[in-house]
């Protein structure tokens, strides 16, 4: 059910669709958390890595620039090679890049890792949204699903800074 379109909206298939949507929403939540959690930590990062204000702006913006620049590209890649496959590869890359942040010793390395995180987010976002859309039939259910996943993403943006 995770990646297939439901052929009917029976109570069981709807329940499975909402469970799958919860998983896809968790992916989106972590992407948005990853995007917003950094901002509170920037002063500490600047001190620890002896980074200039300009370098810290690159730390913050490299993720968004790469993410925005590649999202349409990876949407097309996901259409060609499979949304689930590309999304899962993006999740693996996001996990590895997140782990790599522990080992950075310079601001340049951190910018590179944040850029990799942007690539990973560009891989996961189009697929997760497309898969969420395909879980449901009928405009009403699709609107509810898109509202749910979008709201979860906004929660991630909102709670990221306090968690940072």
Q: What residue spans do the PLM features occupy?
A:
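Transmembrane-helix bundle of Major Facilitator Superfamily
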Residues: 2-164
């Amino acid at each position: 059910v995770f990646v297939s379109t439901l052929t009917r909206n029976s109570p069981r298939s709807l329940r499975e669709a909402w469970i799958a949507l919860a998983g896809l929403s968790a992916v989106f939540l972590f992407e948005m958390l990853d995007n917003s959690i950094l901002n509170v930590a920037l002063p500490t990062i600047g001190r620890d890595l002896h980074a200039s204000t300009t370098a810290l702006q690159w730390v913050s913006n490299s993720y968004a620039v790469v993410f925005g620049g590649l999202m349409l590209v990876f949407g097309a890649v996901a259409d060609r090679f499979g949304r689930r496959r590309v999304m899962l590869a993006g999740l693996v890359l996001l996990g590895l890049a997140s782990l790599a942040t522990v080992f950075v010793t310079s601001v340049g390395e951190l910018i590179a890792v944040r850029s990799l995180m942007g690539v990973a987010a560009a891989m996961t976002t189009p697929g997760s949204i497309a898969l969420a859309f395909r879980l449901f039939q009928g405009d009403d259910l699709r609107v509810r699903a898109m509202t749910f996943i979008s709201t979860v993403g906004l929660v991630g943006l909102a709670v990221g800074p306090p968690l940072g």
